[in-house]
């Protein structure tokens, strides 16, 4: 199977997000990479489901709460930017202060 660099990146994000979901389900607090991966994957899947950029930017701040993340991690993430594919093309989504 031949994958483009972009496809490899998507798979890496998905794998990290899957690990984060499992740890979250066990009640563990997420670290920085897990937090970013989980939010990024949710944005990518939302675009796949047909949501708009505005909807995803709004929903991106409600995916995780401070109580689910290790201390200090929310302050490390001022915004998350991800380029996702929509039916009408690729767009950049920016979520400011994703963990409030």
Swiss-Prot record:
Catalytic activity: urea + 2 H2O + H(+) = hydrogencarbonate + 2 NH4(+)
Family of this protein: Belongs to the urease gamma subunit family.
Broadest EC class assigned to this enzyme: hydrolase
Protein's GO biological process: urea catabolic process
CDD domains per UniProt: Urease_gamma
HAMAP family, sorted: Urease_gamma
Transmembrane segments annotated in the record for this chain: none
Keyword Cytoplasm among UniProt keywords: yes
Pathway info: Nitrogen metabolism; urea degradation; CO(2) and NH(3) from urea (urease route): step 1/1
Enzyme Commission code: 3.5.1.5
Keyword Oxidoreductase assigned: no
Name of the featured protein: Urease subunit gamma
Keywords noted in UniProt: Cytoplasm, Hydrolase
Localization annotation: Cytoplasm
Signal peptide: none
Gene Ontology MF terms in the entry: nickel cation binding; urease activity
Assembly description: Heterotrimer of UreA (gamma), UreB (beta) and UreC (alpha) subunits. Three heterotrimers associate to form the active enzyme.
GO cellular component terms, semicolon-separated: cytoplasm
């Amino acid at each position: 199977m031949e994958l483009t660099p972009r496809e490899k990146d998507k798979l890496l994000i998905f794998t990290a997000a899957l690990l984060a979901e499992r740890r979250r389900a066990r009640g563990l607090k997420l670290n920085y990479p897990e937090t970013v991966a989980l939010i990024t994957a949710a944005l990518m899947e939302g675009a796949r489901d047909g949501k708009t950029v505005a909807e995803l930017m709004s929903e991106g701040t409600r995916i995780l709460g401070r109580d689910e993340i290790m201390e200090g991690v929310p302050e490390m993430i001022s915004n998350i930017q991800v380029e996702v594919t929509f039916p009408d093309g690729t767009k950049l989504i920016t979520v400011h202060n994703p963990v409030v």
